[in-house]
Amino acid sequence: MKFKTLKASEYCDSVRDGTHDSPKKVEKGYKLITSKNIKEYGLDLENASDISEEDYKKVNERSLVEKNDVLYSMIGTIGLIHRVNYEPNYAIKNIGLFKIKNEQKSKWLYYYLKTPKMKNYINSLLAGSTQQYITLNNLRELPIQIPEDIEDTNKIIHILELLENKITYNTHTNNNLLAA
């Protein structure tokens, strides 16, 4: 199997990050997702802050999250990843945003960023002593290896999806048993 390497900025439609501002919290509004809301297998929307519709629209002018985008925690806990496989209605703060319209490309990036090879590579790029972070420029420059044959890509994605679905199911089952 042959691979080619592209920078994330070449592979994705664009690479951005969420707002750096701190929108005022409101009692009921739109969710504002930060790194602490990205979990191993999903988003914790329940503990996300609510922001006003005005702030939501302002944040989304710069960093609108759409279906097939990949979110990446880039401050504090680095490397938690979420692939958006639905139409979202939240805004993001200090989160890497890999914008990808193509579903298969989105899935490949999601799984590729989870590999030990990429995690080690990203760890070598971290800055900051008190609170570590990875820069937006470093995210744009990430080398993404992709099979040259799209059929190889599809086969790999299929296998990884089956494994992840099984892991997710087992994790939920274990959590339910612990809660009982």
Spans of features found by a protein language model:
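Residues that recognize and position ribonucleotide moieties
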Residues: 1-4, 31, 88-89, 111, ...
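A short beta-sheet element
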Residues: 34-35, 51-116
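Sequence-specific dsDNA recognition surfaces
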Residues: 5-24, 36-67
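A generic structural signal for short beta-strands and their flanking turns/coil linkers
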Residues: 29, 47, 92-94
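A short glycine-rich beta-alpha junction/loop motif
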Residues: 74, 89-96, 128-157
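Non-catalytic DNA-recognition/assembly elements of restriction-modification systems
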Residues: 1-18, 141-180
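Short, positively charged
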Residues: 107-140
